[in-house]
Structures are given as structure tokens and as C-alpha cells.
């Protein structure tokens, strides 16, 4: 998570209350987080995860949880172990869908979805890719 993107340093776990440009940034941050979580924890994320509200909420919560440990905000070894043990249950939530998630292939569909849900690309905002 990039705390420089918002005032206060933390995005909300849900995008719906944000303004259209903030929504774009929220989704872009989640995209980057999902790409990192997929690699780090070998999660079976499926193509189109952004269209499933349960998967979006699970991924946003997991990203926030991991971020708190990575930044040192939380220093709780039993809590970190709990996170690691929860990965199997979280992974089960992410198995819905036919095709595996491939960031380079799925990027255009993801960007189209952002427009569908009312996001507005900020001015001078590059493509985060994946």
C-alpha cells in the first residue's frame, strides 16, 4: 500500500464511498497489492476477481492486514501466524472463476471494469501495470 496516495496514510477497505478519482486510485492500489500477494503467498487468484465483491473485500482486507505487519505498525508474532494460517481459507474464497489471473493479460478488462463502476482516471495518472 502506498500511504502517499491519501491523506492519513490508509485507504478504506471499501471503495464505494470514495469520489470517482479516489476510486480509481483505490482500485489501482488494490491491483498492485493483489499482484504482490499472488506472488508472495502463491494465492490461486482467478481472472475477474475485481467483479466479485467478496473477493474484492477479502483481498483488500488481506492487503491491509499484511501491510500493517510489513510497515511495523503491528509487531505481533502470534497475529502474523494467524494471518499465515488464514491464507488457506482466504485462498478458498479466491478460487471462484474459470481462468487463473494473469496481470498482463487481464489488465485491459480490469481498466474497463473501473469505468463501469464509476471510477475516473486522475489527470496525469500513468498505468500501474502488473
Residue ranges with predicted function:
Residues 17, 36, 55, 109, ...:
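Low-complexity, compositionally biased segments
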Residues 35-73:
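Amphipathic alpha-helical interaction modules
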Amino acid at each position: 500500500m502506498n500511504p502517499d496516495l491519501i491523506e492519513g496514510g490508509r485507504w478504506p477497505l471499501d471503495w464505494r464511498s470514495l469520489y470517482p478519482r479516489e476510486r480509481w486510485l483505490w482500485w489501482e492500489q488494490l491491483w498492485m497489492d493483489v499482484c504482490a500477494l499472488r506472488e508472495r503467498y502463491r494465492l490461486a487468484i482467478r481472472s475477474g476477481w475485481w467483479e466479485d465483491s467478496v473477493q474484492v473485500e477479502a483481498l483488500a482486507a488481506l492487503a491491509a492486514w499484511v501491510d500493517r505487519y510489513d510497515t511495523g505498525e503491528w509487531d505481533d508474532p502470534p497475529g502474523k501466524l494467524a494471518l499465515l494460517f488464514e491464507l488457506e481459507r482466504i485462498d478458498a474464497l479466491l478460487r471462484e472463476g474459470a481462468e487463473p489471473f494473469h496481470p498482463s493479460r487481464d489488465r485491459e478488462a480490469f481498466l474497463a471494469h473501473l469505468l463501469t463502476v464509476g471510477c475516473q482516471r486522475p489527470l496525469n495518472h500513468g498505468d500501474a501495470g502488473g
